Amino acid sequence: MSHNTFGHLFRVTTWGESHGPALGCVVDGCPPGLRFTLADIQTWLDKRKPGQSRFVTQRREDDLVKVLSGVMLDDDGETMISTGTPISMLIENTDQRSKDYSEIAKRYRPGHADYTYDVKYGIRDYRGGGRSSARETAARVAAGAIARQVVPGLVVRGALVQIGKHRIDRANWDWAEVGKNPFFSPDPAVVPVWEEYLDGIRKAGSSIGAIVEVIAEGVPAGIGAPIYGKLDQDIAANLMSINAVKGVEIGNGFAAAEISGEDNADEMRVGAGGDAVFLSNNAGGILGGISTGQPVVARFAIKPTSSILSERRSIDSDGKEVDVRTKGRHDPCVGIRAVPIGEAMLACAIADHYLRDRGQTGRLK
């Protein structure tokens, strides 16, 4: 299987499977001299790890990261300094239950990658989905923690803005609320609504989709490239690569089709310091594939997980018609834990384009 690497200068390769002994990543192209601690990486993994509420899978994984290469310890014994060589990180799997999947060893779960993996490779790891499992994304979050260190002043944040048909009220948006509830919701008023709704989904053994919004602030103007090297193109590709993502939009996205050119175009003025000031941000911080200096805003839609308790019609690898009912531990809404994953993938795209711009123009330090 190829295509386990993304990025151009800031390159990330992930490896490992859901029920293997470990998973991890190799980050290549990281500039030398970056200073960070293990806690700077672990903080983001702790946001993503399973088993933290009744609304996510009850698989218990500590997701403790080990940095194996690419750094030297400073004199304080805690701060790591990147050397410019590949940074390799490892996360052990400790709570696999492969026996939960024995009944689907030959059966294809509807909506899952079982059938397509078998068609393409002639073999598949049915234990938790193997490489197609969202367990792989823990490594991406670790890589994203490194990416955040590459761009000076970069702040990447995310929030869950919709579960099923239940949306947040954007008038209530408060970043301080995101870490106070199990949904990463910026709207405290919607939390009890989501709790009741997801309890019903969870008890029925079903699942539901969601929408995540990720925002990057501190992105310098001018990174990205026209035509085939667009910043938003690579952001979309990074977000689409996340398990279960079925749609991505930048800025106004699909809503731009409903408004006029007067309403959509971001007007400009000269600020007090002589810099360009935008009066709105419908473009999501990107014009012509190049950043404007405004916050970069993206949203992505996540389908309901295909692992549900209801019996579904399918076939097996012998070509027989079967009914499939998935056992095991699964997220009733995978969109919840996709928030830190989306943040990581956005950070990686921006770090990559930042380094590409620095190499091409020399204007960024």
Curated annotation (Swiss-Prot):
GO biological process, one term: amino acid biosynthetic process
Cellular component annotations (GO), alphabetically ordered: cytosol
Keywords for this protein: Amino-acid biosynthesis, Aromatic amino acid biosynthesis, FAD, Flavoprotein, FMN, Lyase, NADP
Catalysed reaction, written as an equation: 5-O-(1-carboxyvinyl)-3-phosphoshikimate = chorismate + phosphate
Amino-acid positions noted as binding NADP(+) in the UniProt annotation, renumbered to this chain: 48, 54
Keyword Glycoprotein applies: no
Pathway annotation from the record: Metabolic intermediate biosynthesis; chorismate biosynthesis; chorismate from D-erythrose 4-phosphate and phosphoenolpyruvate: step 7/7
Class in the EC hierarchy, top level: lyase
EC number: 4.2.3.5
CDD domains reported in the protein's UniProt record: Chorismate_synthase
PROSITE patterns, sorted: CHORISMATE_SYNTHASE_1 (PS00787), CHORISMATE_SYNTHASE_2 (PS00788), CHORISMATE_SYNTHASE_3 (PS00789)
Protein purpose: This reaction introduces a second double bond into the aromatic ring system.
Subunit annotation: Homotetramer.
Name of the molecule in the record: Chorismate synthase
Originating species: Sinorhizobium medicae (strain WSM419)
UniProt lineage: Bacteria, Pseudomonadati, Pseudomonadota, Alphaproteobacteria, Hyphomicrobiales
